[in-house]
């Protein structure tokens, strides 16, 4: 009986910091949209959307061109931070000098509605 109690106590003590880290740090995802190179660069460019600080790990991230889902989108492997929140990078080739509007759309359980962040050519 005492072994069972010790295992239960140990499991409880190991799980509490994890649970505390998740509940104290999980808020809505942070979204950053940027190009790999400056828009005036002659290099082939990529639109990046870095989403961080989210938990649980289930998330949908879409890159948009004029409101429509972009093609040839690649996604990094899911990674996590010391506080047990998750991070993802999504990117796609794009022409920053076109007259199109580019954005990143994030859907997550901590959001009441999808979050759309537009790419700002000047930042």
From Swiss-Prot:
Pfam families: C1-set. PROSITE patterns: IG_LIKE, IG_MHC. The keyword Signal applies. Disulfide bonds join 49-104. It comes from the Eukaryota. GO terms for cellular component: extracellular region; late endosome membrane; lysosomal membrane; MHC class I protein complex; MHC class II protein complex. The keyword Disulfide bond applies. Residues 1-21 form the signal peptide. GO terms for biological process: antigen processing and presentation of exogenous peptide antigen via MHC class II; antigen processing and presentation of peptide antigen via MHC class I; peptide antigen assembly with MHC class II protein complex; positive regulation of immune response; positive regulation of T cell activation. Belongs to the beta-2-microglobulin family. Residues 29-118 form the Ig-like C1-type domain. Component of the class I major histocompatibility complex (MHC). Involved in the presentation of peptide antigens to the immune system. One of its GO terms (molecular function) is MHC class II protein complex binding. Its main location: secreted. This is Beta-2-microglobulin. It comes from Monodelphis domestica. Keywords: Disulfide bond, Immunity, Immunoglobulin domain, MHC I, Secreted, Signal. The gene is B2M. SMART domains: IGc1 (SM00407). It is found in: Secreted. Heterodimer of an alpha chain and a beta chain. Beta-2-microglobulin is the beta-chain of major histocompatibility complex class I molecules.
């Amino acid at each position: 009986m005492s072994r069972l109690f010790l295992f239960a106590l140990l499991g409880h003590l190991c799980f509490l910091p994890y649970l505390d880290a998740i509940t104290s740090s999980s808020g809505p995802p942070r979204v950053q949209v940027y190009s790999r190179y400056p828009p005036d660069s002659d290099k082939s460019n990529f639109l990046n959307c870095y989403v961080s600080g989210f938990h649980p790990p289930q998330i949908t991230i879409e890159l948009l061109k004029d409101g429509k889902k972009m093609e040839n989108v690649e996604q990094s492997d899911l990674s996590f931070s010391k506080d047990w929140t998750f991070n993802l990078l999504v990117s796609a080739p794009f022409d920053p000098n076109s007259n199109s509007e580019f954005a990143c759309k994030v859907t997550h359980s901590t959001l009441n509605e999808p979050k759309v962040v537009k790419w700002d050519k000047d930042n």
